[in-house]
Amino acid sequence: MQTLRCPACIGRLQPSRESGSQTRLVCRECGEEFPVIRSIPRLLLSPFREALLGNGTAAGTDAQQLETALSFGFEWTRFPEMYDEWGRSFLEYMQPHTAEFFRGKKVLDAGCGNGRFAFYAAKHGAEVWAIDLGPAVEVAQRNTATAGKVQVVQADLHKPPFAPDSFDFIYSIGVLHHLPDPEAAFQNLLRYLKPGGEIQIYLYWKPEAQPVKRALLTLVTAARKITTRLPHGINYLLAFPAAVLAFIFFVWPYRIMSRIPALNAIAQKLPMKQYSVFPFRVCVNDQLDRFSAPIENRYTRREVEAWLSRAGLNDIRVAACYGWIGNARKAG
C-alpha cells in the first residue's frame, strides 16, 4: 500500500473486504473503489473500468487505446509461452545494463504484456511492479508466479497508480509507440521515477538509409490499412503464412549465408534475421503484433533523442536494437 495509489487523485489506498465479497482497494481521499480479482489489483478509471471489467464502451482516442489493449490481450493469450531465449533478449533490450544492475532495485515494467521481461527483471533480483491495460495481465500473472518479487497490476499507462518517485528504474519495451500520444505517456512516467533513477524505452524505428527495410515497411503499412480492421481471429490465422514467408525469404537465407564467410556481410543486412535464434512461433507472434495493433508510430534516432532531451533528462543514450533503445537519467 506504500507504492500503490489511487489513479484518480494519487490518494492512499486501503484494503476493504466485506463478508463473502472480493477484496477491494478504497481510496482514503476520494473514495474510489477498485476490485482485486485473482490477486491482481484492477486500478482502472472510466471508461476503461466499464469496458474491461463490465459491459461499457469507449470513444475517441480512448476507443483506440482500448482496442489496442484488447488486441494485445488476444495476442498474449494465444502466445503465452515463455522461452529461455527471452533471457538473452531481455538483456539485449536493457543494454547497456547487465543482470547485476537489477539486484535490489525497485522497477516498473510499463506495459508488461505476457510478463516475459518482468520475469527476468525479478530473476535478476529486482522488485518488479508490472502494469498493463488489457487482459494480458492474466497471462503475466501466471508467467511471473515463480519469478520472485513481482506484482501485476491492471492499469492505464496514462494514469499509473503509484506514488510519485517510487522507482529506481522504469522500462517500457515496445509499448509507447502503440499509444495515441506516445511522448505524453513517456513524460508522464517520469513522475514515478526517483531522482537519479533511469528510464529505458524501446521504440520502432523509421528506416531512412535502408532501402530493403524501407520497402518492406511500405508494404506492411499498406497491408495494415486492411488488417487492422479485421477480427483478431482472422489476423491470428494470417500471421502464420506471414511468418512462413519471413522464414523463406529472410530467416533461412540468413542462417545459410551467415555461415559462409564471403556472404556473411550480406547476411547481416537482411531484415528479420533476429528470428533465426527463436522458435517459429515467436515470429508468428510478432506478425500478429505487426498487423493487428490499431496504432503504430515510428521514429528516427533524432526524434528519440529529442524525446529524452525535451523531458530534461541527463546522460542520454540511443542505440539501435531492431528499433531504438533510449536510456536516460532523471536529474537529482
Regions found by a protein language model. Name each.
Residues 1-161, 169, 295-298, 303, ...:
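Conserved N-terminal segment of class I S-adenosyl-L-methionine
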Residues 161-163, 180:
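GHKL-family ATP-binding catalytic core of two-component histidine kinases
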Residues 169-180:
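A short SAM/SAH-binding and catalytic strip from SAM-dependent methyltransferases
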Residues 183-195:
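A short glycine-rich, Lys/Arg-flanked "PGG" loop and its adjoining helix->strand segment in the class I
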Residues 198-229, 237-239:
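Conserved class I S-adenosyl-L-methionine
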Residues 214, 226-297, 301-309:
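Substrate-binding/catalytic lobe of Class I Rossmann-like enzymes that use SAM or dcSAM, i.e.
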